[in-house]
A protein has these predicted regions:
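Glycine-rich active-site/cofactor-binding loop and its immediate structural neighborhood
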Residues: 93
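Contiguous, often N-terminal, cationic amphipathic patches that form binding interfaces
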Residues: 1-77, 81, 86, 98, ...
Length: 116
């Protein structure tokens, strides 16, 4: 739960909402096939459905009120992973801040798989 203090009171935004915004920002970037989830039982990476994107996003709120975001993605073959990662970081920072007012400490992108 992300908490934002304003002059009028406190705003609480669920991790699911932040994850949905983050996942939508990431998957809108060219070359991203989808969000990824690594199964603990078999160790395989799974492509997540759009309704389950939050499993591929990890959000940490720090004591200072800012947040760190980790994204696990699957990309299409033949794309420049560095360029995709930079675009994702830019999109996520912009959209999360625009929609929630959250201060972003860091956005880390993990390319877990390449799929056709």
């Amino acid at each position: 739960m992300f908490k934002l203090q304003t002059d009028q009171g406190e705003i609480q935004i669920s991790d699911t909402v932040l994850s949905d915004i983050t996942g939508a920002a990431a998957t809108s970037c060219y070359g991203v096939k989808g969000m990824a989830y690594r199964s603990m039982t078999d160790g395989l990476v799974h492509l997540l459905r759009p309704t389950a994107m939050s499993k591929g996003v990890h959000i940490t709120q720090h004591d200072e009120g800012d947040i760190s975001i980790e994204l696990h993605i699957i990309v299409e073959p033949g794309v420049n992973m560095t360029a995709i990662s930079r675009e994702i970081i830019s999109q996520v920072r912009y959209l999360v801040n625009k929609n929630t007012g959250a201060r972003i400490r860091s956005v880390d992108v993990y390319v877990d798989s390449i799929t056709l």
